Every structure is written in structure tokens, then in C-alpha cells.
């Protein structure tokens, strides 16, 4: 989560000056493989950047074989020699003229290692003075790439990261997660040189805001922990130690037992969603546990839902009058949200399925790709500070921009549309995984080509869906904006392509060319409807639709409420 940056667009030079960019509300999430419904390990994070017109560019950094003399560098003066050979990895970087560095955000490499970083966090004032940041030290701007380019395992990724902090220092307080098919780690960098790393339990989950989270640890622990040499002595010398049965509570000690509601509340709501039985009402003074057991196995839908959460169902609902200042997980300033699912039974180079919601999860869709991709769609590589056609980011962000204007009227309709698309993509990805395993077993190049083409096809399909959704949403927003005083605004409901939605729900779709009647059959159920008529017939009974179906370019569209009722 970047703290400050400069944004400049030459095209807008006459009207827009350099503007500060700040990050407010990145949220990290972890689901251990024994806690997930499908046995995958999940690490996830939302980026947060303000202002919110901040394009992300998705690309693949190729494998480099035996080319010594290269360096990894950052605009703050950080320079680190690279190994002669570096691994291929994916990344989700800032647009090139953003002015504050690369910010790879989330990387998965050919060795099956994935890293997401960072969630920024701050220690107390006394700690900052004792362990000051290093001005030209390691920043989030290059951190994920520094790990992904040269780490063959998650553990090696942790060790490489900590060696960098030891040698070059850190310019920021950061939280990072690194995972592979065998294990997952969390790393907390507290200042210029002090840190703690912990292997995350496979049977637990975690959701956290911008605050250090590692709790009670034994300073003598070696299995599953790595501590900087002077971590505990620094805590003791500053008189900050908070102990229990001889163990140090790192989060309480490093922060001098302080929490910010804007961060702590996001940690609490994650716990409340995944394990309501073990957490009560929100309490500002509570240091919520980093890890806990979920009440039920966690699904991918659960994780997506958390990243769309705005404290609905609580008194802190960010959309209620008086709660406008609440720092929810889902915010308008999110340029992308990513969820990395690591499959133990997938080929190493494609072990991770990364789901990316361009423009933020609340009003966008999660697009999947396997980590073995060797290239990304051209629309992912569009690099511009201002709106441009054929851009993944802008295609989805324009929907977010409209829906954000009135969540009461527009959010549910947008989320309903994307939830259906995500359900269909999840079903497809189950088949894709099996096909990928078969192809990789035959030939690695075949496997790579397959997953690359598939990712590009899914991007193209969902961009087309986004354009359809945007057109409908823009129509309703424009209608509502022009209403006379006292008129009731329209609540948005999207339409979706009937054939693919009905087939996904298990229906056979027939069409009568003579009268244009469309028939859906599933077992004993039979539904008949026509474009232009808001009345359908289900098993002999008339049913009123919320709007009449319509046909455009040979595709019949029906209201989402009709599909939800199938």
C-alpha cells in the first residue's frame, strides 16, 4: 500500500498540477488450506490509492538466464544486484508515468511462489526513533518483484526478503505474505532493520487492516519463526514489552498498545464475517487476534464478499447517514483487488490462480488467470494516466465511478450481475485446472500456451460484459440525474444474456423461429417467454418479469431477477 506518490499527465498539463496520492485502506486476507472449502491456500489484498483514477498495468516479466550485472532499483536510490538468472513472474504495476516507482502489487513466479505486498503499518513514535526507516532502503515499490524474481520456495522468499532488509534497510513499515504449495508466511517489517516472520497455520484464517498483527511469540522459537537479531532487545530497551507467560506480544509492544479505528474495524469485520461465534461487538481497545478458526470452511465467494464489505448489517454501515467517514474494506479508492488461490495438485508453474478485480472489488468482477501465463491481453498493458479505450482498468473503473455515486440505487444491481459472471467463471476454472494438468503433463509449452490463451479470452469476454453493463447503468444514472423534484429514482437492475445464464443453471434453451418464443426446460419445469413481453409462462402459470426481455445483435437479454429465480 503506497503512502505517497506523484501523478502527472502531460496531456492535462494545462489544467492539472502535480497531485499527491495517498493510500488509506489496504486490507490483507489469508485462508489456510485446511480452512478453505476446496483445500487451496489463499492470500489476498486490496490496494488503496487516493485519488482513485490510478491505472494498474498487468504484465509478465520473462525468465532471464545467465545475464550477470543487472540490478533492481527504485526511485528513492535503492539498488540491489540481481542474480544472473531470474525467474519469470507476473505483476500488477502502476502506470509508467505515476512517478513513484513500479509497485508490482502481486507476483506469482514459475517456481510456484506467490507474494502480495504490502499492507502498510506504523509502529509507535518511540520505535520509529529507535529503529528509523532508511531513506534509500527497500520500499513496497519493488518489494514483491525482489522476492518473486529469485525465490524458489515461500521459505526462501522470506529469507531473501529479510536478507535485503538486513543489508539495505527498509524505508517503510510493511506487512507481506508469501506462499507456495507447501506453506505460507507473513512478514512484518517494523522499522529500518527490525522484523518478524511467521509461518501461518494451515487451519486458520486472517483478515487485517493497516496494523501490525503478530501477537504472542517465544523469542527462542526457531521452527516457523524468524526474528531480526535486535528485535527483542530493542523492545526491552524502550520499555515497550508487553508479555504473557514469558512471551512477547509483538503488535502491542511495537505499537505501544495503540490501535486506530480505521484499521482495527476492518480487522474486526473480517473476523465477524468468517467466525462470528468467536468475536463480539466492535471494541476500539481490543487487539483482535491475527489468526482464528472460521465457523465454516471458507469459499472463494466468501473472500470476494469480504472485499465488497462496507460493514453492512452493523451500526457502522458506511452507507448509512453519519457514517460517511468510515474506512470500510470496499472503498472507491481501490485500483485493484487480488485473490491468489494456490492449488496443491496443480503443476508448479501454474499452481496459483490469481483473481483480479480491476478498479476494486465492490463494483467490478474478479478475472482469473493461472500463474503459468507467458503474456497478458493487450488491454491489460494499456498504460495511461487518463481514460483510454481498450484498457482493462478503465473499462471496469468506469462502472465503479458510476455506481459509487449512489450505492443505495446502483450497488446491488451491479454486484448481482458480476456475481453471476463469477459463478460461471469459477465453474469453468474447475474444468480448466484439469485440462491444464493434462497438457502440462504432456508438454510444458502446451500448458503455458493453453493458460495464456484462456486468460486472454476471459478478459475479452468480461470486457464485453462490462461494456454492456456500463451502457445499462449509464442509462439509469442519466435518467435519475434528470428527474424533476419529487420523482422517484430508479433502482438499477442489470440484464444478462439469457442463453448462457439459463444453460449455466441447467436449462435447455429452445427458440421458435415462427413466433420468436423462447423455451427453457429443466426436468419438469418449462418456461416460455418472448422479447418485448414482460410476461412469461412457467409451468402453465403467468409470471411477471421486472422488465421485458430484449434482443440486441442476436442476443436476448433478461433481467437479473429472472435469472436469480431459475
Language-model regions, residue ranges each:
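A contiguous strand-loop segment
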Residues: 26-140, 160-285, 289-290
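Second-shell loop/turn segments in exported
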Residues: 129-134, 142-151, 491, 548-553
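Substrate-recognition/cap regions that form aromatic- and gly/pro-loop-enriched pockets
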Residues: 316-442
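Primary recognition of N-terminal secretory signal peptides and signal-anchoring hydrophobic helices
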Residues: 476-566
